[in-house]
Each structure stands twice: as structure tokens, then as C-alpha cells.
């Protein structure tokens, strides 16, 4: 949880950089890019942190089976593919839960809008998440997307 909080703090510090990247990627007006795009990513991140502080990753099955447990475990390697039109929104909706649940992930942003995802990669690195947990690949959907979605070591695909 503390790494996500560090990430969130760094995200807010790089707000203008993220906004500028979105303007370049989408041609979005500055207010739209800042408030709705960058702001949405911040809001999602903050909401996930708040939710995860209360989430029980292990709990009893129920009153009828007190010795049996429900244990939420990482899914494994996740391939996360995001579109160009909501770059930060989709990145945070995919990356933050994967980080929080302990999954290793490969993020492939749209080839039309990779800049904001590159900043997210920098923030994850700066927050000191373990090396190899987050991986960023750039490329087109036909080649890179196909490689990710057909790889036998990928346990989950989010598109």
C-alpha cells in the first residue's frame, strides 16, 4: 500500500507533465486534458488506495465454515492493452489494481498515445516497485498486441 501512496504523490507532482503528454497524444484542450484526463487517473488511483486499505485479501468463508478461508491471490502475468482515447484513465484502471494485487504486468499502450504511459512507467520506477513487476512495451496492435495475447505465459488479458 505504501508504494501506491508514493506513486500517487509522485503522480500529483508530475500532473503538468502528464497533462502535456495527453495534449500531445490526443490533441485535447488543456483544461480537458488536465481536469478530465489527468484528474481521472488521480481520482482512480486515490479511490483504489482508499478501497484497498479496507479490502480483506484473506477472510473466513462464512459463519457456516469458520475454518475455511477465501484467499485472494495474484492472477499472474497480466497483459494490459489500452486505447488512445482515454490513455491515463485506462492505464490507471488496469495498472493500479494489478500492482495492488501483486501481479506482474506488461502494459501496451496505444501506439497513437504512448507518452502518458511512459510517464506512468517512470513514476512506478521512481516509487521503487520491485524490478520486473511493471513492464512497458510499445508497438502496434497487430504485432505487439498479438504477441501479448497469444503468449502462453500470460495469465490474463485486459483490453
Task: Please describe what each predicted stretch is.
Residues 1-66:
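N-terminal Rossmann-like NAD(P)+-binding subdomain of aldehyde/semialdehyde dehydrogenases
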Residues 57-159:
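Rossmann-like NAD(P) dinucleotide-binding subdomain of oxidoreductase/dehydrogenase enzymes
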Amino acid at each position: 500500500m505504501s508504494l501506491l501512496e508514493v506513486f500517487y504523490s509522485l503522480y500529483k507532482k508530475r500532473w503538468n507533465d502528464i497533462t502535456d503528454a495527453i495534449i500531445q497524444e490526443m490533441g485535447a484542450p488543456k483544461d480537458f486534458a488536465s481536469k478530465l484526463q489527468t484528474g481521472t487517473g488521480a481520482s482512480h488511483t486515490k479511490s483504489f488506495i482508499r478501497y484497498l486499505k479496507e479490502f480483506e485479501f484473506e477472510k473466513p468463508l462464512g459463519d457456516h465454515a469458520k475454518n475455511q478461508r477465501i484467499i485472494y491471490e495474484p492472477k499472474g502475468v497480466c497483459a494490459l492493452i489500452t486505447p488512445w482515447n482515454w490513455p491515463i484513465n485506462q492505464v490507471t484502471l488496469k495498472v493500479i489494481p494489478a500492482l495492488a494485487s501483486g501481479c506482474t504486468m506488461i502494459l501496451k499502450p496505444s501506439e497513437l498515445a504512448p507518452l502518458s504511459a511512459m510517464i506512468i512507467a517512470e513514476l512506478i520506477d521512481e516509487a521503487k516497485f520491485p524490478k520486473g513487476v511493471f513492464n512497458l512495451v510499445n508497438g502496434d496492435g497487430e504485432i505487439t498486441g498479438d504477441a501479448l495475447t497469444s503468449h502462453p505465459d500470460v495469465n490474463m488479458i485486459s483490453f
